[in-house]
């Protein structure tokens, strides 16, 4: 295969997401990220807001969101909250919807964030303005474990503020692609998973992975149905593909046939987690 630089892979990936219905947007820095979030948040909640948020109301929302752990941010993301407006009225607001058609999907790249060091993030997927999926790419031939190491460096030095709302990381060198859940803990490469189709065929190529995993309806299902907030360990978890397909099969069995079903698999496969979902 011909040589492909990381920059070429990145642009090819963004073009693929554009074809899948994502809007492309330039977000050069963190301030621009916050500004875009405000615009998209108001647009997403337009049916509940009869007028734009005031500066004080927006500050109140940011105070609710910022300074929290990854786990706390994941809980906030999935909860509705009551905003008391300056005129005394109250309104219930939310950050995203389980119906993918009601959300705003954007993709940006090369956002520069200043922490202990100056870092430039590869590709960020935004849902209603919030950075929920972060993609780190390496050129073909580079072990994707290098991307995990890069994520860890970013988490240590600059993944703060709204970036605590990242739910899923995706790493790829174009040929091999994996995903894993964000965490307040050190990330382990063993918890990064390949995605597969229903017949358990791995979709390792970044384009094939994007078409399946990052389809707008599917990624919303992953975020709303197939992630677990482990309150005991304060841990965010994402399900493996066979667990997702097992849950979907169990739900179909229960809803369409009104009959019972069971999970059968090997030790350590995640039967308890699948049954829980």
Where are each of the predicted segments found?
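ATP-dependent helicase/translocase motor core
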Residues: 2-277
């Amino acid at each position: 295969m011909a040589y492909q630089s990381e920059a070429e892979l990145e642009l090819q990936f963004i073009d693929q997401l554009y074809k899948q219905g994502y809007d492309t947007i330039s977000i050069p820095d963190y301030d621009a990220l916050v500004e875009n979030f405000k615009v998209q948040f108001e647009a997403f909640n337009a049916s509940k807001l009869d007028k734009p948020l005031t500066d004080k109301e927006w500050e109140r929302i940011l105070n609710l969101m910022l300074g929290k752990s990854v786990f706390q941010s994941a809980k906030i993301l999935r909860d509705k909250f009551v905003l008391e407006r300056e005129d005394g009225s109250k309104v219930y607001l939310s950050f995203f919807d389980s119906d993918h058609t009601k959300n705003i999907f954007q993709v940006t790249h090369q956002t520069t964030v200043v922490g202990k060091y100056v870092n430039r993030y590869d590709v960020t997927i935004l849902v209603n303005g919030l950075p929920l999926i972060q993609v780190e790419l390496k050129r073909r031939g580079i072990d994707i474990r290098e991307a995990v190491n890069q994520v860890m460096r970013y988490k240590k030095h600059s993944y703060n503020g709204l970036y605590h709302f990242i739910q899923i990381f995706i790493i790829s060198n174009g040929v091999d692609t994996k995903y894993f859940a964000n965490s307040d803990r050190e990330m382990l490469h063993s918890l990064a998973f390949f995605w597969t189709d229903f017949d358990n065929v791995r979709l390792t190529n970044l384009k094939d992975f994007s078409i399946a995993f990052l389809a707008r309806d599917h990624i919303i299902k992953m975020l709303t149905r197939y992630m677990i907030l482990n309150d005991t360990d304060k841990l965010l978890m994402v399900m493996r593909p066979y667990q997702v397909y097992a849950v979907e099969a169990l739900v179909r069995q229960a809803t369409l046939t009104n009959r019972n079903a069971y999970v059968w698999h090997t030790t350590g496969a995640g039967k308890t987690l699948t049954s829980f979902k």
